Design a protein with these regions (language model features):
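Terminal signal-anchor or tail-anchor transmembrane helices
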Residues: 13-21
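A short, structured loop/turn motif at beta-sheet edges
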Residues: 89, 235-236, 419-421
């Protein structure tokens, strides 16, 4: 299911609001019961209430890489919440779990962003890593512009158990994000920018934002955009702290308090850098001399990324130790150096070609939106680096029919295409379907499994060896 279909579904749910008692047990999402209990208590009750079929879809081992994965509302896997999968009482219990993970202010935000205000928990994906009845766990709710993590901090020291993702479509393509649930965060950041001197503004403004999903902590050796908050005057530092407080204030007091502990352990908000951006990573409207709607606060152990163009996608990642980031699943190998951009694409293409037994692999640079830190690499790290959840596919083409760019890439690797030969090309389903001109005149695509599985298999067997 994609976001457009889900938004259409939200309209259908809104129209169904008049179906009366029947709707209560079928289409409509339950409101919260008003019961006040802890997330842990409610999550344990929820798991107990799931049917065997629902448990089979929703429950995962605690060390499953799904616990590390995030994006801005792509389907993560798990159970699709609906009247067909959970009865009214269980969906109400899930609604109570969601509300318990939010502050009083947050209960007026997250449940009212985007289609959630019409659908509630309906059509969200539910995944529970671990078992809240007996041990550590993480409950994940994913919907339109939402990956909400509920449960205690991870043993790895990640606040919220890992990155939080939120957003809202309102104000789409409009200056100032009018009527957006999280507009207040933008306004506070813009007040900070307005308070800067011209020289400070020049250092804060960066031409192009990083990809929104790149929020892995970098540690002390990281490179951060913008200016150190510590270098600003006290009143401006107070505004930076107000930005962070406005973001963390959405979540339950105990969860937010742990995030603040993580920040203070690493120097507080003063240890972050503040930047705003002329243009998003994916392009679009440029800020020019006007206020930007994209900002980022980042330090060795924390990232706050607010992308308000064309509408809001926002990401939070805060951890206790920037040198020991969240890593879930099997340790596959040791990465000798940071991989991003062209270097990460080289790893992807090497794995794709080897796993698909292809002559050449093609993965576009503009689709690389991840980063692999140096050091031990877990299965979850590769799931995050391959953020789009694409399938690996194989297509075939005659040498004479290869796109010029692909033929040039082959020559750069010492393979001179023969017009009369037929070549196996490993790529991703999106390219074979939507951007076929980048490949040439090709035959039908044949699936070869999930790309992330190919990456895991390659790193497990060959480490970080790359094609020449």
């Amino acid at each position: 299911m994609n976001r457009r279909l889900l938004l259409k579904g939200a309209l259908g749910v809104g129209l169904a609001a008049g179906v009366g008692t029947l709707g209560r047990y079928t289409v409509l999402a339950p409101p919260p019961s008003g019961r006040r209990a802890s997330v842990d208590e409610l999550a344990a009750e929820l798991v107990e209430a799931l049917s065997p079929a629902a448990r089979a879809r929703a429950l995962f081992p605690y060390d499953h890489p799904l616990r590390q994965y995030y994006n801005r509302g792509l389907w993560l896997g798990g159970l699709t919440v609906s009247a067909a999968t959970l009865d009214w009482d269980t969906r109400r219990l899930l609604t109570d779990v969601m509300y318990a993970g939010l502050s009083d202010a947050g209960r007026g935000r997250v449940p009212f962003q985007d289609s959630t205000r019409f659908m509630g928990v309906n059509m969200m994906q539910l995944a529970v890593c671990g078992d809240p009845r007996v041990g550590p766990y993480q409950l994940l709710l994913s919907g339109v512009h939402l990956n909400l993590r509920l449960g205690s901090a991870s043993p790895e020291g990640a606040a919220f158990g890992g990155p939080q993702v939120y957003g809202d479509q309102r104000g789409n393509e409009r200056v100032g994000l009018p009527n957006n649930t999280y507009r207040y965060q933008l306004e506070t950041a813009q007040r900070l920018v307005a308070a800067l001197t011209p020289a400070e503004r020049a250092h804060v403004r960066v031409a192009r934002a990083p990809a929104q999903v790149i929020v892995g902590v970098q540690g002390a050796a990281g490179r951060f955009d913008g200016v150190p908050v510590a270098d600003l005057a006290p009143a401006k530092r107070a505004l930076a702290r107000e930005v962070v407080a406005g973001i963390l204030g959405t979540y339950a007091d105990d969860s937010a308090a742990y995030a603040w502990q993580c920040l203070e352990r690493n120097g507080g908000v003063d240890a972050l850098h503040f930047a705003d951006y002329d243009e998003d990573f994916e392009g679009g409207r440029r800020a020019g001399d006007g206020p930007s709607q994209i900002f980022r606060l980042e330090g060795p152990a924390a990232v706050f990324h607010f992308r308000g163009e064309p509408h809001l996608h926002a990401f939070i990642n805060v951890t206790m130790d920037g040198e020991r980031p969240l890593g879930v699943g099997e340790v596959l190998g040791h990465n000798p150096s940071v991989l991003e951009g062209d270097a990460l694409r080289a790893l992807f293409e090497t794995a794709m070609r080897a796993q698909a037994e292809a002559d050449v692999a093609y993965y576009p640079l503009d689709a690389i939106v991840g980063r692999l830190r140096a050091g031990p690499v877990h299965t979850g790290d590769l799931w995050v680096a391959e953020s789009w959840v694409n399938d690996l596919v194989v297509v075939e083409a005659q040498g004479a029919d290869l796109a010029p760019g692909l033929a040039a890439a082959m020559r750069s690797r010492g393979v001179v295409p023969d017009a009369r030969s037929r070549y196996r090309i490993a790529t991703i389903d999106y390219i074979a379907r939507e951007r076929v001109r980048e490949l040439g005149r090709i035959g039908p695509a044949r699936k070869s499994g999930a790309l992330r599985d190919a990456l895991v298999a390659h790193v497990r067997s060959r480490g970080f060896e790359l094609d020449a």
